[in-house]
């Protein structure tokens, strides 16, 4: 009887808080940059979260706040606490929980630590975690991450917009390798505005004098303008 090794199954995860995201980013970063001190103690982890370089935004959190966030991450199995030392030490479990390769983990880590960046910036900033051959390889892994995120997200109405549900089949890979999505820029992603190809027969909101439309149901703090281009595409801009 043939048996196959167990492979990690990606889990449905909730949206992380800024501190939880920062903790995961710090754990992965320090695993590669200072392996001698990894897994990290609570003190070292807090210092990494409050680090003033290679961080955006800069944080000033206490050990108590980090401990609370660690408890939540442990419930999600994203962080594990070691028991081989008298001082508690923590390590990440992202590769197994998310089921993505190390190259994607490297890009995701830099995004967690520094926020939205271009593909060129990601290639430069992730050099210590993984050496990407060129920008196109970075974009390929970003496309894979975006496709996974969209496929794992259940169909739901876009927050603040009275528009169509966001369905996994709406994310398609074209032959030229570019990812197209239907949905709002406020969704989880990499900080980039996705170009959208309007579906035939879909009802569009009326255009205003400026040539832009505003989503129905948006609040003052959550407004999205849809700028249409002559080519039939539109770019979603969060304002």
From Swiss-Prot:
It comes from the Bacteria. Pfam families: DUF480. Residues 196-239 are annotated as: Disordered. InterPro entries: DUF480, WH-like_DNA-bd_sf, WH_DNA-bd_sf. Residues 224-233 have a biased composition (Basic residues). Belongs to the UPF0502 family. This is UPF0502 protein Bcen_5249.
């Amino acid at each position: 009887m043939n048996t196959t090794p167990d492979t990690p199954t990606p889990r449905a995860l909730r949206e992380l808080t800024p501190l939880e995201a920062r903790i995961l980013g710090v754990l992965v970063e320090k695993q590669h940059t200072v392996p001698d001190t990894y897994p990290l103690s609570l003190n070292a982890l807090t210092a990494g979260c409050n680090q003033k370089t290679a961080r955006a935004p800069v944080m000033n959190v206490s050990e108590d706040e980090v401990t609370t966030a660690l408890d939540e991450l442990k419930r999600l199995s994203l962080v594990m606490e070691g028991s081989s030392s008298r001082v508690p030490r923590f390590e990440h479990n992202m590769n197994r929980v998310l089921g993505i390769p190390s190259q994607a983990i490297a890009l995701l880590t830099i995004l967690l630590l520094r926020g939205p960046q271009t593909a060129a910036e990601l290639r430069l900033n992730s050099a210590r975690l993984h050496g990407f051959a060129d920008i196109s390889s970075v974009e390929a892994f970003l496309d894979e991450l975006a496709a996974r995120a969209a496929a794992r997200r259940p169909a739901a109405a876009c927050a603040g917009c009275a528009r169509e549900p966001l369905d996994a089949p709406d994310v398609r890979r074209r032959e030229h390798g570019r990812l197209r999505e239907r949905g709002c820029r406020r969704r989880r992603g990499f900080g980039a505005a996705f170009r959208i190809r309007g579906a035939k027969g879909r009802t569009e909101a009326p255009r205003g004098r400026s040539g832009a439309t505003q989503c129905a149901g948006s609040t003052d703090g959550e407004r999205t303008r849809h700028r249409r281009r002559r080519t039939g595409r539109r770019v979603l801009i969060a304002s």
